[in-house]
């Protein structure tokens, strides 16, 4: 039986990677993250009005996995684009999110899967919901036209491709005077994903500069693809997964 929470709790990336190196290691990580993404893309957020049968289901259809390990031992996996992590200068450590906290930020909403005993050895793992579809067939009350969402939905076969619109899909369905809840529900069946995963949108490569600070690699430096906004070198990790 599928259960995203258990999958995350038992996930041990390094145990599965073992002695793999280079491309083999990268491919193994993609395979592991694909399983997590498939669990997420098979489930949905249930937004339910209090004391009512009125509800909306919000199904993620595209997610990006983010994974950053704190600390400086050699084999740590670094993903410096992660928002919720300790400062590089060591001046501010961020406490751990309990499993399943929704983290709202300028790019959208992350479902967070953090682990560890303290901020210094934390694993900062999350999934950014990049695209989603809304099933409001059971929304019996509080209906109103979510204009911008409707426009987006109709353009892409019911799929909303703007990640920040998830705020509205989750938080603007029902009145706070009645109250509502948001709960994750695992899918009954696994959905099929696109064969190939993709790179994450506008995620740059990082390097350490001469002062040993972590900085983004500019598009003008070296060869390779630039990010969609043309400012930086694109990070090549294919951690973006989509429903077929």
Predicted features and spans:
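A cross-family signal for N-terminal binding/gating loops and helix N-caps
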Residues: 2-244
């Amino acid at each position: 039986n599928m259960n995203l929470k258990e999958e995350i709790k038992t996930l041990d990336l390094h145990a599965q990677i073992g002695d793999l190196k280079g491309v083999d290691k990268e491919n193994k990580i993609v395979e592991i993250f694909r399983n997590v993404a498939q669990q997420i893309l098979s489930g949905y957020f249930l937004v339910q009005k209090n004391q009512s049968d009125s509800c909306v289901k919000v199904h993620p259809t595209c997610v990006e996995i983010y994974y950053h390990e704190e600390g400086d031992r050699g084999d740590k996996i670094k993903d410096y684009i992660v928002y919720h992590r300790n400062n590089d200068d060591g001046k501010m450590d961020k406490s751990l999110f309990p499993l399943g906290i929704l983290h709202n930020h300028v790019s959208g909403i992350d479902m967070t899967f953090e682990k560890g005993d303290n901020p210094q050895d934390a694993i900062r793992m999350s999934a950014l919901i990049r695209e989603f579809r809304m099933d409001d067939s059971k929304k019996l009350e509080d209906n109103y036209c979510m204009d911008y969402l409707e426009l987006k939905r109709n353009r892409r076969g019911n799929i909303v491709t703007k990640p920040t619109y998830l705020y509205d899909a989750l938080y603007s369905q029902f009145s706070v005077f009645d109250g509502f809840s948001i709960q994750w529900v695992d899918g009954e069946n696994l959905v099929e994903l696109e064969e190939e995963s993709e790179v994450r949108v506008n995620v740059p490569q990082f390097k350490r500069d001469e002062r040993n600070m972590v900085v983004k690699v500019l598009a003008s430096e070296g060869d390779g693809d630039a990010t969609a906004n043309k400012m930086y070198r694109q990070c090549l990790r294919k951690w973006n997964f989509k429903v077929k």
